[in-house]
């Protein structure tokens, strides 16, 4: 009997589990799901570097760990520097780094520790050309320290320091395009991914493993706690982020762009479908929604042009 295509696609997700149950993540945590997929893709022969963030708590305090892999806790700003040093040290000792039979060095940092505090170290890691993978799990705020805004927080969002209410003190800046900054370094491989599309994420992790030099993946990872969303809606929200083109899926490989949307010819859904499931957007006015929708569609058209010209 021939295996259906949908089943074949599911079989691309490895069965091996290297992220143990009983960790301290909140229910519906997108970051913990993403980390589980990383360890499925790369296995135990992996060194995971985690700065100060939610994942530090989720992984567990020394000497305990929810990861069946090597774990290195580091300071907030230093993920890019530490994975650079580990990679260089392994090579100095004669170990093979990256590739299917090499040791995988992975930086796993949130948007605050990447887009803000860790941007300089990330830039240096890419510029020096280290054989490692940097993954920014993007939950769009400093969730571990109390839901403060980051430069990856979207326009119109409530956080504890953009509180909305009668004075309407919402986030009024659009989300920083971190992946564009990374691509400006002419990195060999960069991609966006989402926990709602695990097969696509696994494929990109495997590609990052094979391509020499630095790789970067920006992973959309909902936080029900910070987004004021039901814990059973994380995957639906992540899927709508893609379907509305708020967070489009694409790859940049050696100067070429490729869009990976599930239905690339389908028009994006209205941004309201993404917003309405999250309490963090409840203070937005009609004008706010229109401003965000305009930005999303402009960015989507820009990405399509890049893929057309540099595809």
Curated annotation (Swiss-Prot):
SUPFAM superfamilies: Thiamin diphosphate-binding fold (THDP-binding). InterPro entries: PorB-like, THDP-binding, TPP_enzyme_TPP-bd. Its EC number is 1.2.7.7. One of its GO terms (molecular function) is thiamine pyrophosphate binding. GO terms for biological process: organic acid metabolic process; sulfur compound biosynthetic process. It is an enzyme of class 1 (oxidoreductase). Keywords: Oxidoreductase. It catalyses: 3-methyl-2-oxobutanoate + 2 oxidized [2Fe-2S]-[ferredoxin] + CoA = 2-methylpropanoyl-CoA + 2 reduced [2Fe-2S]-[ferredoxin] + CO2 + H(+). Heterotetramer of one alpha, one beta, one delta and one gamma chain. This is Ketoisovalerate oxidoreductase subunit VorB.
């Amino acid at each position: 009997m021939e295996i259906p295509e949908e089943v074949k696609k599911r079989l691309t997700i490895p069965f091996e589990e290297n992220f143990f149950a009983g960790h301290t993540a909140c229910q519906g945590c997108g970051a913990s799901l993403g980390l589980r997929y990383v360890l499925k893709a790369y296995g135990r022969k992996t060194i995971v570097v985690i700065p100060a963030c939610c994942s530090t708590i989720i992984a567990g305090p020394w000497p305990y760990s929810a990861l069946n892999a090597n774990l290195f806790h580091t300071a907030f700003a230093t993920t890019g520097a530490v994975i650079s040093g580990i990679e260089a040290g392994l090579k100095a000792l004669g170990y093979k780094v990256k590739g299917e039979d090499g040791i995988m060095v992975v930086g796993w940092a949130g948007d605050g520790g990447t887009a803000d505090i860790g941007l300089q170290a990330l830039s240096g890691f890419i510029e020096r050309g280290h054989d490692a993978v940097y993954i920014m799990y993007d939950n769009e705020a400093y969730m571990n320290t109390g839901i403060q805004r980051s430069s990856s927080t979207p326009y119109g969002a409530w956080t504890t320091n953009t509180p909305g209410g009668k004075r309407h003190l919402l986030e009024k800046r659009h989300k920083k395009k971190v992946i564009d900054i990374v691509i400006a370094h002419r990195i060999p491989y960069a991609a966006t991914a989402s926990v709602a599309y695990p097969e696509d994420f696994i494929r990109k992790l495997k590609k990052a493993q094979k391509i020499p030099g630095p790789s970067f993946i920006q992973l959309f990872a909902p936080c029900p706690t910070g987004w004021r969303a039901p814990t059973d809606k994380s995957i639906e929200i992540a899927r709508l982020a893609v379907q509305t083109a708020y967070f489009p899926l694409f790859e940049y490989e050696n100067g070429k762009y490729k869009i990976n949307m599930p239905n690339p010819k389908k028009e994006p859904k209205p941004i309201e479908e993404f917003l309405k499931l999250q309490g963090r957007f409840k203070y937005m006015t009609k004008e706010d929604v229109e401003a965000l929708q305009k930005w999303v569609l402009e960015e989507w058209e820009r990405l399509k042009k890049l893929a057309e010209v540099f595809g």
